[in-house]
Amino acid sequence: LDADHLCLTVKKVDQGLVSSWLVEKSQVGDILRLGQPYGDMQQSIQTPKLLLLAAGSGITPMLSLIESLSQTKQLNKTPVQLMYWVKTHQDAAYTDYLKEIAENFPNFSYQIFYTQEQDQRLNQNHVETLGALNEITVYACGPSGFASTAESLFAEAAVLQTEAFSLSQFSAEQTDIGFINVTLTKSNKTVAIPKGQSILSSLEQQGIKPNHGCRMGICNKCACTKAQ
């Protein structure tokens, strides 16, 4: 791939509208409109080692990083270790690619763990095999529980960046009632938002149509800046 082409990794999920269409019905010549890419995981590594932690679909940004590091030859000088968790052997993606990268770049190594077949989940034992955390940049991506575990286990890393593709469970206190006033900086309009309701839903009820995508706060398309 080059700067003019994108590679999309799509896993079909049960009753998934977009993934089912892409896997079953999309054809050569279809025109798709994509938003701007988003993410804080960059390839400029300032520590002696980079550790990538991926669970499930969290492998996708890691693949992009690995490919970029290989193209820029940074893999020739920076040791990169990937630890990848999936449910079963069948769920592991891009294993041939990872094997090829490991064969071509001695600084790259990877391990795949199977949570359903062998119950190998991220834990303290994995941390103890890595040496001094203050010399490692750690990137982690996966479900919210996986990301939270990584944040706890690798809190002493020189750099720690996590991304989650599912939301943590949250329940508002039943006694937490009332409204919060939110003032929009562009229109200077003030909107009363019920506690426990998302800003996006409240704005839509007021006839305002902000940009949005997943409606869960994951894709960041509806992200906005808090002025104060």
How would you name each of these model-derived features?
Residues 1-31, 35, 48-49, 86-89, ...:
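Ferredoxin-reductase
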Residues 9-10, 76-87, 111-114, 161:
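Short internal beta-strands
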Residues 37-38, 227:
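Short, surface-exposed secondary-structure boundary micro-motifs
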Residues 39-46, 52:
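Short, Lys/Arg- and Gly-enriched loop/turn segments at beta-strand edges
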Residues 49-51, 81, 137:
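Structural motif
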Residues 50-60:
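Short, glycine-rich nucleotide/cofactor-binding loops
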Residues 59-73:
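Histidine-anchored nucleotide/phosphate-binding helix
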Residues 88-228:
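Reductase modules of NAD(P)H-dependent flavoproteins
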